[in-house]
UniProtKB/Swiss-Prot annotation:
The keyword Amino-acid biosynthesis does not apply. Residues 1-24 are annotated as: Disordered. PANTHER family: CENTROMERE PROTEIN I. Disulfide bonds: none annotated. Component of the CENPA-CAD complex, composed of CENPI, CENPK, CENPL, CENPO, CENPP, CENPQ, CENPR and CENPS. The CENPA-CAD complex interacts with the CENPA-NAC complex, at least composed of CENPA, CENPC, CENPH, CENPM, CENPN, CENPT and CENPU. Interacts with SENP6. Coiled coil: none annotated. Belongs to the CENP-I/CTF3 family. It comes from the Eukaryota. It is found in: Nucleus; Chromosome, Centromere. This is Centromere protein I. One of its GO terms (cellular component) is nuclear body.
Amino acid sequence: MATQRVTRNSQQQNRISQGSNSRQTSLLDWMVKDKSGNFKSVLKESSSVEDSTRTDDRTEGALQVAVGYFQKGPKKASLSKDKVLEKHLTTVENVALSNGLAPEAIDILLNVALSGKFGNAVNSRILKCMIPESHISEDSVLKAVSWLCVDKCSGNTKVLFYRWLVAMFDFIDHKKQISSLYGFFFASLQDDTLCPYVCHLLYLLTKRENVKPFRVRKLLDLQAKMGMQPHLQALLSLYKFFAPTLISVSLPVRKKIFFNNSKNLWTSASLAVRLRNQGAFPEPLNLPLRPTTGRSLKRKWNSHSVIPALNSANKEYGEKTASLFDYLSSERSLPLEQLQRFPQLLESIHCLELPSQMCSVLNSPLLLHYINCVKDESILLRISYWLSQALQEECVWYNINNYEQEKEFINFLDLVIRVQCFLQEGFYSCEAFLYKSLPLWDGSSCRSQYLQLLAWIPFSSFSEVKPLLSDHLAPLFFTSSIYFKCSVLQSLQELLQNWLLWLSTDAHVQPTTDSPLETTLGGSMSSVSQLIEYTGWLCVVAMRLESSSTLLLHFILDFYEKVCDIYINYDLPIVVLFPPVIFHSALLSLDATILNQLCYIMYRYRNNWTAAKKNRYLQKAKPEFSLSSKICKEYNYYLTAMVCCLWTSRPFKAGVYTDPETIENTGGTQYKSTLNIVYHPSLLSYAASFLLQESPEEMTEHLSSIQGKKWNWYLDYLYSEGFQGLKLFIKSSVHSSVPKPEENTE
């Protein structure tokens, strides 16, 4: 590796000596480019030199003088004694904070800071003001890394450089050569001081081909030496994600925050520069160049400014635009700005290069199609990492009493939700955002967005998700309106569907006969069952609070309509019934659609149960996969109760005693028939309408006349009115051996 590094450094020096063709630019070249107007200036990109003011000219000149001083200045100087040094350093800081620095200026100042030409205090201040105006050249980073090899700078300067490199990672125009230095960065893990920041950088650089057995062993040795450090767990978790067979130690299934970014020196400053250059702020912001006390920058939220524009990583400024045919006939990558239509994506998919700022793909449906095709896990990891910073570090709307920017933030969340729906995958960073902000949520602001984020929580053990639901969401659920309760139940139904889709896909990818997967699948089924049971508990409490509301019961049965078909629709060995309170509330409901939906759910439960019993695999599987006899008895009880009530007019079990005085108070003596399909409270209007349709001249005909042939005609009438659930239930559960009710059913 040393030979490769020397060769690379010599090649870089040759490129520097070539002048205009080099990306590494000397101060003289930079000044010439500034005067010619063909390249970016130090302050900002300007299309016309004539429109610049005298103040801008003076600032540009002062910055050029300051950068020239640092490039050729004294090797050692003291800030307290050298006023010229302080003056030039202040100039660089002011320009960096107001408009950012051009790539050429960053290239020069990085070399100054890491070459050890000045003291630690000066080097630290230079690194803290390395805020890019647009992008950072990859060659500048490579040259800076080469200074680390000769050990010219102090340990504190190295730490600050790695922190800067992580913060500015998405601003680097190329990363191919930086990725080739993966081994060098990995070797730097030996330094205990650098280890957390190098782990963070490696987390951003790691791809599947970087995961090697010797690196896994090294990380495990470091963990044994240093303990369960979050940064080591992050890298090990990523390695296990790419190569699960190489790591057998137990790791946290999901840690909400691996890296602490709350003391990032450059994030808010670089964002403010970008917003100002885009016209979001009329005046420069006064931002400190030192760690803050944890308070985020209170700025106007603008989702269009937070998500950077889509720019190619390999775009060269001033390059003549080429046609699509030119890129297809060569090995060059197609600039993303030329990608406008889906046919172009299909034609150029082999020569497409994703942007360096990966978060910019959120605004591009075409690139989201591309991400879905390539299935590169590192892409989703980079997007999730950026979302983690954007949601956890910069979103302060939920902990301050200021909702003026709620609309802009809602638009941003809607965009994130649309991306998750398109990719059919939830981001862990969004779940971490829910854990952080849900305790402060009032249940009203961004309600739709919050509940949609809840529906996209990635699959995990229910014990990890339950605190989010029981500790924070349940109190809001119980104390809010019925409409909020219905919305939460809808979100839990979508969450269940997303989990089932993920599990069914994963189960088909790997064979279910291997013992390790059986254990995993058994735990997964347990998590799904616990989610259904917890939702059932919420439903029972909500029914009591809302006095068995029909609207609420509709949403509850919609949820169990999804539950009853799990085995057939998703091929997962699980059958979970609704609680008795839900069953009896639906059976005795005054709404005919509720009764019809209950009949359909019971019919689907029967089909799933029958299919599960016929499955040979379940019969030979371990006990954790066998269908519970308790569930079987419970289903038979529900089935018997429905048939007895709706068909045989025997709603009570033998041996059940009811006080006759209580029956008399109900106003009816034929209590046994009060719940059949003729006298059921939800079907009385249909029975009366049927009699009027059959015998319009006899206005006094009694409901008891519906028997014999009329009974069958009445059933056909109900089926014609849309009671398909009732039709399926009767045809599947009621047989000819069951006697039809006679005129006197007492």
